Amino acid sequence: MLDAFSKVVAQADARGEFLSNTQLDALSKMVADGNKRLDATAAISANAATIVTNAARSLFSEQPQLIQPGGNAYTNRRMAACLRDMEIILRYVSYATIAGDSSVLDDRCLNGLRETYQALGVPGASVALAVEKMKEAAIAFANDSSNVTIGDCSALISEIATYFDRAAKAVV
């Protein structure tokens, strides 16, 4: 964002002009959009433990075989690994949200995840369902009007949903 400000100032300075109302309005909109992005990311980050825990509870309620003997989340070690992976995915979704770009999610989290899960025998469909459950909860927190700067956040909420969709698709 600072680069955008520097660019506008440099252009005005090169012309020997003050910033125009149009330029100021564009910068103001960029700041407002950035504030919404910050608010949404803060809401997701502040509620990360709740998002992950509730998604896991819901998943294991729907698929109890995962936590029964022989299931992929059976034993404390496997359960902890499952919760850790869910938290990592959520963390990288929050990074993509603040950056407004999925490359950090793709490059540092999702690339190779399907292959890793297949090699470990982790059921991708179950992970995808857990991601979907996290998506629902995270969007509810991010879209809570008490947490977000006033204004239309529908485009941002839609963008956040696509990050979760990318993650769910990456594991199946």
From Swiss-Prot:
The keyword Transport applies. The keyword Membrane applies. Keywords: Antenna complex, Bile pigment, Chloroplast, Chromophore, Electron transport, Membrane, Methylation, Photosynthesis, Phycobilisome, Plastid, Thylakoid, Transport. GO terms for cellular component: chloroplast thylakoid membrane; phycobilisome. (2R,3E)-phycocyanobilin 2 binds at N72, R77, C82, L83, R84, D85, M86, E87, I88. (2R,3E)-phycocyanobilin 1 binds at N35, D39, T149, I150, G151, C153. Its main location: plastid. It is a peripheral membrane protein. Heterodimer of an alpha and a beta subunit, which further assembles into trimers and the trimers into hexamers. The basic functional unit of phycobiliproteins is a ring-shaped hexamer formed from two back-to-back trimers contacting via the alpha chain subunits. The trimers are composed of alpha/beta subunit heterodimers arranged around a three-fold axis of symmetry. The phycoerythrins also contain a gamma subunit which is located in the center of the hexamer. The light-harvesting antenna system in red algae and cyanobacteria is formed of phycobilisomes. These are composed of the phycobiliproteins phycoerythrin (CPE), phycocyanin (CPC) and allophycocyanin (APC). Cyanobacteria also contain phycoerythrocyanin (PCC). The phycobiliproteins all share the same subunit composition and organization with variations in the covalently bound open-chain tetrapyrrole chromophores. Light-harvesting photosynthetic tetrapyrrole chromophore-protein from the phycobiliprotein complex (phycobilisome, PBS). Phycocyanin is the major phycobiliprotein in the PBS rod. This is C-phycocyanin beta chain.
